[in-house]
C-alpha cells in the first residue's frame, strides 16, 4: 500500500502561452494515485471533516478538526474505486485570476458544489493508495502566501500547523500502521 502526501498529486507544470501562468499536466502517476492536482487557493484555516470515523485510517480521529493549510484542489480520477476519508466545505475556488494554476473547469468539487476531497483510499490490484492532501509547510521565503484569514495576529515565520495537529499525527500513525499491517 502506498501512502502519498500533499505534493505528490502535482507533477509537471506547463507554461501557458507567453505568460508566467502554468497549467498542471496529467501523467501516468496520476492514474495510479487516483488524484490530480488542479490548483490551490491561498493558505487558510480549514475545518476537515472525517467521512468515516470507523475506518482503521481514521481510528481515534474526531468527526472534524481544524488546521491551517494550503487547500489542494484534487480531481478524483476513479470515483468508483475511491473511498473518501477526509473532506472540507471549501466551495468554488475564489483565488484571484493571477494566482494559482490555470484550469479549464473546476473538476475537484464534489457534486454538491461546495465539498472538496482532502483524503482518500484507492484500491489498486491487491494493494492501494492512501492520499492525504494536507501537510503544507512554509518558511520565511514563502510567508507572503499566508492568507490573512488564517491568522489572528502576527504572521508566523514558519508554518507547519497541520504537522503539529494531534489529529494529523494520529492520521499518519494510522496510515503507517494500516499500510504495513
Residue ranges and their predicted role:
Residues 9, 91, 136:
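Residue-level detector of flexible, active-site-proximal loop/helix-junction positions
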Residues 10-11, 45, 73, 80, ...:
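Amphipathic alpha-helical interaction segments
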Residues 94, 101-181:
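Extracellular ligand-binding/catalytic regions of CAZymes and related secreted enzymes
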Residues 17-133:
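Catalytic beta-strand/loop cores that center a nucleophilic Ser/Cys/Thr
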Residues 13, 17, 41, 139-141:
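Residues at secondary-structure transition points
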Amino acid at each position: 500500500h502506498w501512502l502519498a502526501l500533499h505534493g505528490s498529486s502535482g507533477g509537471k507544470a506547463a507554461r501557458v502561452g507567453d505568460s508566467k501562468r502554468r497549467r498542471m499536466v496529467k501523467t501516468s502517476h496520476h492514474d495510479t494515485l487516483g488524484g490530480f492536482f488542479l490548483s490551490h487557493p491561498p493558505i487558510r484555516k480549514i475545518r476537515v471533516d472525517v467521512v468515516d470515523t470507523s475506518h482503521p485510517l481514521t481510528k481515534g480521529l474526531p468527526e472534524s478538526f481544524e488546521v491551517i493549510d494550503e487547500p489542494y484542489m484534487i480531481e478524483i480520477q476513479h470515483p468508483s474505486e475511491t473511498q473518501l476519508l477526509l473532506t472540507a466545505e471549501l466551495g468554488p475556488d475564489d483565488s484571484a485570476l493571477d494566482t494559482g494554476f490555470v484550469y479549464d473547469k473546476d473538476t475537484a468539487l464534489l457534486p454538491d458544489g461546495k465539498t472538496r476531497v482532502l483524503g482518500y483510499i484507492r484500491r489498486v490490484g491487491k494493494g492501494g493508495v492512501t492520499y492525504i492532501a494536507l501537510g503544507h509547510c512554509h518558511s520565511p521565503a514563502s510567508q507572503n502566501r499566508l492568507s490573512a484569514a488564517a491568522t489572528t495576529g502576527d504572521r508566523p515565520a514558519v508554518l507547519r500547523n497541520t504537522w503539529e495537529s494531534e489529529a494529523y499525527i494520529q492520521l499518519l500513525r494510522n496510515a503507517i500502521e494500516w499500510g504495513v499491517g
